[in-house]
């Protein structure tokens, strides 16, 4: 998103990418922040509340693997999720439950990240149909509305602009960005 995104580019943002697991990146002062070992912004392991009130990791709630697991448990095939991103065949109750869980997890991750870093924006993207990305973004904003953000500057929550190819493009851009940006 930092290199290939379109439109207004915030200087400080957290990027979430839905793939097999949820991943991401942290951009500070207009530059990718890799951290000491290169894993900064790896949002998947962030602790978030689960539906049972216990602590889960974000990737346990907000990943395509979780959606596939839910589909298989309900007797639905998830094979097509991995083959193409334009249209998914998922029953509405399963899709709604997955989006709600993902949005709730994202909201808590955004709150935690915002408490540490003054983020201008959070961008949500991934290997999924555009309508589902739109709905995840909308429900994440609604979940943030329900959290106590006292003392924390709430970032804008927006959709990413690169889409399903962001993971591959981002990986290809890292050496270029390190050398030239």
Where are these regions (language model features)?
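ATP-binding/phosphotransfer module of carbohydrate and carboxylate kinases, centering on a glycine-rich
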Residues: 3-9, 50-181
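Glycine-rich phosphate-binding loop of actin/hexokinase-like ATP-binding domains
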Residues: 4-62
